[in-house]
Every structure is written in structure tokens, then in C-alpha cells.
From Swiss-Prot:
Family: Belongs to the universal ribosomal protein uL11 family.
GO BP, one annotated term: translation
Modifications the protein undergoes after translation, according to the UniProt entry: One or more lysine residues are methylated.
Source organism (scientific name): Synechococcus sp. (strain JA-3-3Ab) (Cyanobacteria bacterium Yellowstone A-Prime)
PROSITE patterns (alphabetical): RIBOSOMAL_L11 (PS00359)
GO terms for MF: large ribosomal subunit rRNA binding; structural constituent of ribosome
Role of this protein: Forms part of the ribosomal stalk which helps the ribosome interact with GTP-bound translation factors.
Gene: rplK
Disulfide bonds: none
Protein name: Large ribosomal subunit protein uL11
């Protein structure tokens, strides 16, 4: 018989830097999960993505066991990394902080495609372009 799912916890954690401190400890502790086991597994699976924020969806079962699925980093983080900037614009439609080329946009869209609500890369590019615009980033051809 399949294990009964008790909860699904979604967290955004720095890759390779999961610790039992908040926000991870309280989120998993209230469900009785072995926090150190999760931290070790997460850090091992995300060691190659150091410096990125990697969202994770943790499924917690009745017997206090868990499984987790790693998602792709948020589009805003990928855009900031591509441009080499610290943060987006505080006034996105007035102050521009940089510009992305179509090739960079396509690369980010292809990376995010599995997690986006899009059927093809063109639709994913439109979603990423919208995120970029809201950060004060222009798209150039």
C-alpha cells in the first residue's frame, strides 16, 4: 500500500547551504521530519549549483519519511546572474538596470521550461521577458 501524504512544504533555499536553522527547521520540525537528513540530501543534490536559490517541494508522509523535488531557480535570479547585477530596478519602467539579448532570453527560457506553464520555448521566452521588464531590464534583438 502507498504511503499516505501528510503535507507538502515548499521552500526556496540557497544551493548547498541548507541548515536546520529557520526557515527549514520550523517548517519541517512541525511535521516530525529528520531535519539533518533533509539538509544533507539537499546539500548533496545542489552542490553543483552553488550561489543559486533552488526552490524545493518536500512531500512529507505519515511515517515521517519524505521525498523532495528540486525546481529550477527563479527567473529573476537567472536574469540577475546573466546580467551580473545585484538587484533589479526600484523603478522598473523609469530606471533601466541592463539589457538582455534574445539569445540570453532563450537560454533562460530553455532552463526554466520544465517549471513554467508553457508548451514551447517561444511562450516561455514571453514569460521570462515579462519578468525581465518588471525588473527594469530591456530586451534587445
Amino acid at each position: 500500500m502507498a504511503k499516505k501524504l501528510v503535507a507538502v512544504v515548499k521552500l526556496a533555499i540557497q544551493a548547498g547551504k541548507a541548515t536546520p536553522a529557520p526557515p527549514i527547521g520550523p517548517a519541517l520540525g512541525q511535521h516530525g521530519v529528520n531535519i539533518m537528513a533533509f539538509c544533507k540530501e539537499y546539500n548533496a543534490k545542489t552542490a553543483d549549483q552553488a550561489g543559486m536559490v533552488v526552490p524545493v517541494e518536500i512531500s512529507i508522509y505519515e511515517d515521517r519519511s519524505f521525498t523532495f523535488v528540486l525546481k529550477t531557480p527563479p527567473a529573476s535570479v537567472l536574469i540577475k546572474k546573466a546580467l551580473g547585477i545585484e538587484s533589479g530596478s526600484s523603478e522598473p519602467h523609469k530606471v533601466k538596470v541592463g539589457s538582455l539579448t534574445r539569445a540570453q532570453l532563450r537560454q533562460i527560457a530553455e532552463q526554466k521550461l520544465p517549471d513554467l506553464n508553457a508548451r514551447d520555448v517561444e511562450a516561455a521566452m514571453k514569460i521570462i521577458a515579462g519578468t525581465a521588464r518588471s525588473m527594469g531590464v530591456t530586451i534587445v534583438d
